[in-house]
Amino acid sequence: MKAVGALGLVALAGAGWAVISDDAPEYSVERVVDGDTIIVGNDAGETGIRVRLLSVDTPEMDGTGELEGCYAHEAKDYLTELLPTGTAVELDTDVEDTDRYGRLLAGVYLAGDDALINAEIARGGYGVAALYQPNEKFYPQVKAAE
């Protein structure tokens, strides 16, 4: 990746590729909250970072773990299978990097893998593509995976 020039990085970013700098923090999954939200920590010692996966929406669970939407537990279980505790992940943000709840908004990748976890949720049938303007970067991949 270091051999790619600045224009190449811009072109890759525009094409929907994850462009994560070499000095980006390394993250690991602490736990899965629901089908589209995880908690991560990083190698800088920060813990409890709440991450909302962009461009995908799954059934919601309330704070007690009770169902608010059909298949909420199944969506959470599926994401837990994809991202068990301790899994190394890479995060890629878009135009707005946090939401009104203070969650980091990101595309999530297994470390060293180019498969977008956000799209894998839709591909598995546990979520649907959702466009949250102005964040559009991951929407085409998630929509295509439905």
Predicted regions and their residues:
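Small beta-barrel nucleic-acid-binding modules, primarily SNase/OB-fold domains
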Residues: 2-146
